[in-house]
Design a protein with these regions (language model features):
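Hydrophobic transmembrane alpha-helices of secondary-active transporters
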Residues: 10-16, 31-56, 124-130, 144-169, ...
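Transmembrane alpha-helices that form the ion-translocation and gating core
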Residues: 10-11, 15, 62-97, 177-228, ...
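Intrinsically disordered, low-complexity non-transmembrane regions of multi-pass membrane transporters
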Residues: 23-25, 82-120, 279
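Entry/N-cap segments of selected transmembrane alpha helices
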Residues: 4-12, 52-77, 118, 163-192, ...
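Interfacial helix-loop-helix linkers and transmembrane-helix boundary segments
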Residues: 20-31, 48-64, 85-91, 111-112, ...
Length: 317
């Protein structure tokens, strides 16, 4: 885990240095490709595990329960955060026209279609693993870890190379930094309730609930860290559970962030989005029809959670 964190922070510094030299890195395509490779390798591990395939339905129900509990907890705690700090709802900047409403629906559909690529990549990996189309060694945690390190480096470079990072950081105050803390506590406290009815320990439930929508990083980190402790098969099961939980969170956030933001409940939208408040869900939270106040709240929240995921998993795993 120290290796992962070192790569992350070194890459953030490198990205900032490159930006100061006048270069803007285009990391989106590289990040997408690396995520798809990771998800395919993860699917390969699942397809090679017959016991896990037989338990797929029970894992699906467990993921739905933990994801639902975590999302409810994050939204409730963001409301508590708002009440404790006496923060009003952020008003909508401009009313929406009928044409813009149609465009918004089209944009949402495109984003949902983009997210649907990941389950398809996962399924393709599972089929290749099940039918033995690729060497079994490709599904090992060692191969996934190498690709994971590449992803971590790309994430760090992308964060450090953000042109708006300095501006966003200048707008940060103590209140904004508290929101991700409430998101973490609310998500984990409510996710922990799943341990009462599910055949997983409290520690394992907290582990799989600590992704905050960051499906690619959390699932592979769990696989890498847990394999040596509980065995490859059990680690793949937990990592699969984590992947499904975080995919569900992103899909729900894509649907609900826009109406929440437009009703002035920006803190709830940001908290629900988790890590994706800074990228995938950012256009739903910050656009021409919402307040410009939303941007620093959403970006800082996403950055803090993105850094907290490997830190939390290093403790829980």
């Amino acid at each position: 885990m120290f290796t992962v964190l070192s790569i992350l922070f070194c890459a953030i510094i490198a990205g900032a240095v490159v930006l100061r030299m006048g270069f803007k890195l285009q990391m989106e395509r590289a990040l997408d490709i690396t995520v798809f490779v990771l998800i395919a390798l993860f699917g390969l591990s699942i397809g090679q595990d017959d016991n896990l395939l037989h338990n797929a339905s029970s894992i699906g129900w467990a993921a739905l329960l933990i994801a639902s509990l975590g999302m409810v907890g994050s939204v409730l705690f963001s409301w508590l955060y708002q009440r404790l700090l006496h923060l009003p709802n952020i008003p909508v900047a401009v009313a929406e026209t009928a044409d813009e409403h149609k465009l918004k629906k089209t944009d949402l559909l495109l984003r949902l279609l983009r997210s649907s690529k990941l389950p398809l990549v996962l399924l393709a990996g599972m089929l290749m693993g099940y039918y033995g189309l690729l060497p079994k060694s490709w599904g090992s945690s060692k191969v996934s870890f190498v690709v994971l390190c590449l992803l971590i480096a790309e994430v760090g470079l992308s964060l450090g190379n953000r042109p708006d990072l300095k501006t966003v950081m200048k707008s940060v105050d103590f209140k904004i930094l508290l929101l991700p803390f409430f998101t973490i506590v609310g998500t984990l406290l409510f996710s922990a309730l799943g341990a009462i009815v599910l055949p997983f320990s409290l520690r394992d439930v907290l582990t799989v609930g600590s992704g905050f929508g960051y499906y690619s990083l959390s699932s592979i980190l769990i696989l890498d860290q847990k394999a040596a402790v509980i065995g490859q098969s059990a680690a793949v099961e937990l990592a699969s559970l984590s992947l499904l939980i975080n995919l569900l969170r992103e899909l729900v956030a894509l649907i609900l962030c826009e109406p929440l933001s437009r009703s002035g409940r920006v803190y709830q939208a940001v908290s629900l989005a988790g890590v994706t408040s800074m990228d995938v869900c950012l256009p739903m939270i910050v656009n021409s029809r919402t307040s410009p106040q939303n941007m620093p709240i959403a970006i800082v929240h996403g950055i803090v959670l993105e850094i907290s995921v490997p830190l939390l998993l290093s403790v829980l795993c």
